[in-house]
Structure formats: structure tokens, C-alpha cells
Amino acid sequence: CWEQKEKVNKEAKLISSSSLCLTNLPNLWFGFESQNWVMNQKIVLEVVPWVDYKASRGWTKQNKKELETEITRLDFVSSLSKKEIFSGEFIDLIIGKYKYKEFKDLLPSEKANSIQNLAIQAVQNTKQMNDFLEFKRKTAWDFYKKNQHQKAIDYILKEIVDNKWAQAKDYSALGDIYIETKQFVKAKESYFKATQLDNNQLWYQLKYANALVFNEDISEAKEIHKKYKSNNIDVKTSWIQQAKFDIDFYKSKGLNVDDFKKILRILD
């Protein structure tokens, strides 16, 4: 099935599995012809198996396009600043873990789980976790704007907190929703976690103090206000301005703000 008519000394030849004579072949024979009838002669044949690793995994250019389709189904991809880099990394992770047939044979639940895990890994590898988390936060915020408070809470807990990605701003957002829904104990706990993660952001300290008032821990709240009332929350907003704004906001949401009168005496 294959013949080398030219005389050879040391030469490597590649016989591909695509050769018809190698299909379902139990044995492979090599024959040599020599016209040397006088001198002693030794023929050394070395057979080295060679496998095209990438080709053997079955991922053709067309097959990879199926992965591009999977990428379009990932809801967060549009929020990434480096989409192309993410896509390339995601495809590399998939084809590195699975042969094409293995990937196709996965159960739908197995495939969905693997895609989710490898997509997150691709986000991390391409250093785009901030974009990814901002998408999650925006999704929760959209629930909140539609007054779907429980959905917003559940989304933050499941998508961010449970995955150990939560930052101070995430616990602060939880605290805000807990306050509006009169879950004051949970609000206090969430704001406290925010202050632990970022104790330099006075906004979290103020929110924690507000939660203390709703929990009737007035004395502790007063101490926080006394400590920070001469500070600014940011470049333009003072602690006192923000504190009064918060009280008005709570009142607009129908919350009882009577206990805040005790706080206002400290601020005025």
C-alpha cells in the first residue's frame, strides 16, 4: 500500500492512518529489497508511533463553532470588556478537558454544569471578574427596581455571596433591601459585614448606624454618629447631610423614623 522506490539511508517517513491499507489492519509488515550479494548488511528499522494530539481529539474548525454558539447563550458575556479574549480562553478550556465526542456525549445537565464552571474559570483567567460581578449586581438591581425585592435578595445570595465573591458593596446592597422590607436584624448583620470588609468607607458605617437605630440599639448608634459626624462621606457630601438624607428616604418608604429624632439631636 506504500512504496518507497528511491534508495534511502536515514530518512523518516510518515504513514498516515488515512491510508486505505491501514484500515482495520491487525498486522503491519515491512519488506526490504537489497542488491548487495557480497557484503554483510544490516538493516535497522525503527517504528515510532506518532499521534496528532489536537486532531485526535476531534475538534475541527466546524466543531469549535458549536462552542461559539454556547458562548452566545451565556448572559454575562455582553458585559465583558474583553469578549474575544474570553471566548478564546473558554474554547481552549473546553477542548483541553474534553474530546469532541466526550463533550457531545455529556448529559444536558452535565454539559450545562461544565459550561458554567469553565466559563467562570475563563473569566478569572482573563482577569474580568469585576465585569462579571458588575453584571450580577446590575441584574439584582433590575429586580429591585421592579419591586421584586425577594428575587433581588435571593439573586445576590445565590450568585455572589454563596460563591464567596461578595464585597462590601454587595453586603451593603443586601442591607438596603432588608431595611426597605423591614428585616432590620438581617440589615444590621449585612451592614456590619460591609464595615468589616471595608472599614474606611464611612458610608457603610453610617448605614450600620442606621440599622442599629431600627434595631433600637440607640446608644451604640449615637457613639458612631459622634465619632464620624465631623467627617465627609465623599468629596461633596458630609456625614450629617447623608444622615439626614437617609432619614428622609426611610420616611418616604413608609418606615417609622421616630427614633431617629434622638440621632438628629446629636447632629444639629
Stretches with model-predicted labels:
Residues 164-165, 199, 233:
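Short coil turns that delineate tetratricopeptide repeat
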Residues 1-18:
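Surface-exposed beta-strand/loop patches in noncatalytic accessory domains
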Residues 234-268:
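Terminal, low-structured helical/coil segments at or just beyond the last alpha-helical repeat
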